[in-house]
């Protein structure tokens, strides 16, 4: 995996602005891993994809994952800060697309981005979950008669086999003390960083081009430290 330059980040933000969140994740990985095909990345198990997104975040933006969510009980802000490198290293074992999970006498492969994209076509969560399950089923039996508890049980079995497929953290509300589990959507997390960095870069290009008459390529070729120093001098 290669790191992404300032020009890469601007290009990503521009190309991915109107894409579905799943496609944004694959676009970012394609930029960082040009040797991998887009189709191949779409068929990676979700944990493998999220691990790569974590590695990319650490490479470009550093290991700190900071955010917040509102308490469902009282609305108080619950902040969190994680070390992405520690999280990635804790799940450094290989996840194979061929891995099979057995549940209720049936076998299932691990879900991929392509499976989630198919599920996203459906109007409600349960129908989407059933569509993903059917795509992942490797046997001949159907799961049409499964109830919500069966789907939840399979979801737990798949999560145990691929822990990074759904990244969840435990939080405690500082206001009411309510404990909850929240999901970190790694693609959305990474894309928010890409968008913030891109907008800052656009401002720096605009400011320095006006002040010094430099071309965009010249400005982006500067190191971040030098570019920030020039931008600060322009504002002074």
Residue spans for each PLM region:
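Long C-terminal interaction/binding lobes of large macromolecular proteins
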Residues: 1-236
